[in-house]
Amino acid sequence: EYDLKTYKDIHNLKEKIHQIEHLKKYQDEIKNLERNITIFHADIVKQLNINENTIIGFHGQTIYHNPNEKISRQLGNGKLLNQLINKNIVFDFRKNDILNDGQGAPLTPVFHHLISITKKIKLPVCFLNIGGISNITIVKDKENYSELISKDIGPGNCLIDAWVRKNSNKKFDQDGNLASSGTKNEIIFEQAQELYTNRNSKEKLTFDVNDFDISFVRGLSLSDGATTLTDFTASIIGEELSLSLKKYNGKNLDILICGGGRRNKVLIKKLQEYLPTNFNLKLIDDYKINGDFIESQAFAFLA
């Protein structure tokens, strides 16, 4: 895990980069932080007992993603990592997907498909990954990869994390404890929902973390802001998830949650309230899979 300084440096940089021109404007800061992150990963790999033929899948930290502009930028220098650890490195996953007419995200559906088959999970099933951004994979057929549906659907932890970082010395809302102790501001919540629903650029959302901001809760207490943002996040995920799964209305469907957001008990409780009762939220951990490492395992699989 990154130390607190590196963690804050990454998120402070993300908050500066809102358009492609900023990548050039902050190129020195990007280069320095990227080097530090790469060295950190090299030190971790050196501690592992892996043989010389091992292939390393190196994803890095996304700081800007816009497939419409044919760009996705992650912090992490694959060539430098190769020099430092003398291992074969596969990197620039998202950039190469975009260059091959993909969207660059999500890239985990094939791995979700593999999990559903190896764990004999009842199909159809929906995987919901709540990281900084939330994305889904719908697995309908165990044989046919072309039947996979996967897309980003809204914010995950990004709004809550940004609020907590800005207003405390914590990295995130542990287990939703802040949200559980606060009160939702109904007026601000309804205004934010209305603005999101009616925004002219909604169809142009890339669901990069910079598509969203937390300015609308400015002035609230730490806990009230966390509560309001948690409910707002759950409402967007619930709305987009319901739209994506509307063909399953009236049918029982399991939604398996992975990613750090699954630990936020308030977020998950609120999300269930925004979904039809026939959609069952379950933790992927219930299948003896560590939900913290689905994404990293997926990129190892892709590598």
What are these regions (language model features)?
Residues 24-78:
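Short beta-strand-loop/turn "lid" adjacent to the catalytic site in phosphate-handling enzymes
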Residues 52-60, 248-261:
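Short glycine-rich phosphate-binding loop at a beta-alpha junction
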Residues 169-254, 264-279:
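A contiguous, well-structured pocket-lining segment that forms one wall/lid of small-molecule binding clefts
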Residues 231, 282-303:
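Glycine-rich phosphate-binding/hydrolytic loop that grips phosphoryl groups
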Residues 1-15, 84, 90-118, 126-197:
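Glycine-rich phosphate-binding loop plus the immediately following alpha-helix
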Residues 1-40:
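Glycine-rich nucleotide/cofactor/substrate-binding loop typically near the N-terminus or early
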Residues 69-80, 113, 117-119, 140-147, ...:
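A glycine- and small-aliphatic-rich helix-loop capping segment at beta-alpha/alpha-beta transitions
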Residues 54-110:
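Glycine-rich phosphate-binding loop and adjoining helix at the ATP-binding site
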